[in-house]
């Protein structure tokens, strides 16, 4: 996509330099939109915070803050802002609350989101959460889905990038409680007990555990208790190119999360032709559509049956592959950028008009 033509009102975009899916959002927009950028990490030292505050104080144009954690900066700004909200996990999912520091940050985020001129939500589910938990009026919210880089995430030749020579189920994400990895481990243990052809099946887990070492310890302890520790492989960091190969080689992505603002691995897997099994809650039915097997994330029997379908039924696998590839076409960063650009024009140009002095 060519870079979008200049917007009527110059806009500054805060770009997070880290590597999560949320951080990628701002990086992909920066490639495609005619914005000036301010680079920062999601978590700042005191020195970085002071430097960022000074930059904001000098800004003479509207600002797009690309995730809800940056909403705390809205009161520092002298110009209108748009805040993107990716999820409200700390409000919607109680296990995500992490003490007084988190509570203080959440309070500041809430203040900023409410004071923003407009809010982007990455799914209708997140929009509903925003209206429910923060009482933000619907007319102040626009839903713009995330995208996927189809130049990277596309079907690849079968090869051994994962290091696993056995057929494998794939999970991509952290080991935080809301990700529901424990349920996947229990379902995997049950299906391994069914013998051939499941006895050769492995589980590949890609991504760091999360901010707490306790998450990985809990995963390993549960795997040991279930007797499947030797059947699980952990891969901490991979490049996007390597991840695309891993998706393409997997029997299926199994993503039984209890709460997602969007669920980027679902679309990445579909774009690579990987069958997807995911939850029927939160944003996941919205994002997956009819192109995945949707299961109750609290029901290990339902998860086992979905895995059996994908492993044993070639027709099921082929259908999920074809429908997933078609569904993934609906999510591109070009489309995300174009919708964001249109919102800049509507919100910021409208505000500029309101602020302009009348003649006479």
Residue ranges of model-derived segments:
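Carbohydrate transferase catalytic cores enriched for Leloir-type hexosyltransferases
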Residues: 1-360
């Amino acid at each position: 996509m060519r870079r979008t033509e200049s917007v009527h009102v110059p806009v500054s975009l805060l770009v997070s330099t880290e590597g999560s899916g949320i951080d990628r959002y701002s990086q992909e927009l920066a490639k495609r939109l005619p914005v000036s950028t301010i680079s920062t990490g999601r978590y700042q030292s005191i020195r970085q915070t002071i430097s960022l505050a000074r930059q904001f104080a000098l800004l003479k144009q509207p600002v797009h803050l690309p995730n809800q954690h940056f909403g705390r900066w809205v009161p520092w700004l002298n110009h209108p802002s748009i805040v993107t909200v990716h999820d409200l996990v700390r409000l919607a999912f109680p296990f995500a609350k992490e003490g007084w520091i988190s509570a203080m940050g959440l309070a500041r985020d809430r203040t900023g989101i409410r004071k923003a001129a407009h809010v982007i939500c990455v799914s209708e589910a997140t929009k509903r959460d925003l209206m429910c938990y923060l009482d933000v009026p619907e007319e102040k919210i626009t839903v713009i889905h995330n995208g996927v880089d189809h130049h990277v995430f596309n079907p690849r030749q079968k090869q051994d990038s994962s290091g696993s020579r056995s057929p494998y189920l794939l999970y991509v994400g952290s080991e935080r409680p809301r990700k529901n990895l424990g349920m996947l481990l229990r379902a995997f243990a049950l299906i391994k007990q069914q013998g051939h052809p499941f006895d050769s099946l492995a589980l590949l887990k890609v991504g760091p555990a999360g901010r707490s070492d306790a998450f990985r310890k809990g995963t390993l302890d549960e795997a040991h208790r279930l007797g499947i520790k030797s059947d699980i492989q952990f891969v901490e960091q991979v490049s996007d190119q390597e991840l695309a190969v891993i998706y393409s080689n997997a029997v299926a992505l199994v993503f039984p999360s209890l709460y997602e603002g969007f669920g980027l691995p679902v679309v990445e897997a579909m774009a690579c032709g990987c069958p997807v099994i995911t939850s029927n809650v939160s944003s996941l039915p919205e994002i997956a559509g009819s192109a995945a097997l949707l299961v109750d994330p609290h029901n290990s029997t339902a998860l086992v049956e979905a895995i059996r379908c994908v492993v044993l039924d070639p027709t099921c696998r082929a259908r999920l592959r074809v429908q997933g590839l078609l569904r993934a076409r609906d999510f591109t960063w070009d489309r995300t950028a174009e919708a964001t650009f249109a919102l800049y024009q509507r919100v910021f140009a409208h505000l500029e008009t309101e602020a302009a002095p009348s003649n006479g």
